[in-house]
Every structure is written in C-alpha cells, then in structure tokens.
Amino acid sequence: MVNVPKTRKTYCKGKACRKHSQHKVTQYKAGKASLYAQGKRRYDRKQSGFGGQTKQIFHKKAKTTKKVVLRLECMSCKTKTQLALKRCKHFELGGEKKQKGQALQF
C-alpha cells in the first residue's frame, strides 16, 4: 500500500519559480481517445463492411499492475509536471498517516 500526501514541497521547473515550492498532488488519468486520430480513422475504415475482425486483438497480458503517475501542480505559478512512481497494487492519495505502536486496522 502506497500512501502519498495531497501536498508536497518539491522543485518547480516553471520559468517564474525555478525553486522549491509547495505543489498540489493528484493522480494522472488518461484522457478519452480521440475518434479523429489517424490510427483510429484507418482502423474504422478497415473494419467497416464485410470481413469480420481485420486486426488482431491483444490477449497475452503480462503485467498485473500499472505504474502510478503523480501530477504535481505548483501552487504559486500553476506549472504542472508529472512524476512516475514504482508499480503497486494499492495506491492511496492523502490517506491517514500510520501511528507508531498502534494496532493494525483492517
């Protein structure tokens, strides 16, 4: 389980800052795929009409997790950067901090 705080003080590459400043942390989420990208237009054209499936569908998935990507937004200059973490099964943003000597909570 990875628990990341909602704010973090880190270096900002923005032209206005170029120093360590407070950043707002969110989890990156992929946008919706465009219908007008060249590959999608070609695929749809090829699929239309008779003849069934024209390109192979990938089935041999090897990975069980995805790498978590953090989106860091500088609170002073609003510059956004992305930071990739290691793979993990459980990711939590802004969860409760663990206390020393406490009983495990399930």
Curated annotation (Swiss-Prot):
Annotated GO CC locations: ribonucleoprotein complex; ribosome
A Pfam family annotated for this UniProt entry: Ribosomal_L44
InterPro entries, A to Z: Ribosomal_eL44, Ribosomal_LSU_eL42, Ribosomal_zn-bd
Keyword annotations from UniProtKB, A to Z: Antibiotic resistance, Cycloheximide resistance, Ribonucleoprotein, Ribosomal protein
Molecular function GO terms recorded: structural constituent of ribosome
Highest rank taxon of the organism: Eukaryota
The UniProt record lists the keyword Ribosomal protein: yes
One Gene Ontology term from the biological process aspect of the record: response to cycloheximide
Additional information: Confers resistance to cycloheximide, an inhibitor of polypeptide elongation.
Sequence similarity: Belongs to the eukaryotic ribosomal protein eL42 family.
Protein name per Swiss-Prot or TrEMBL: Large ribosomal subunit protein eL42
Organism of provenance: Kluyveromyces marxianus (Yeast)
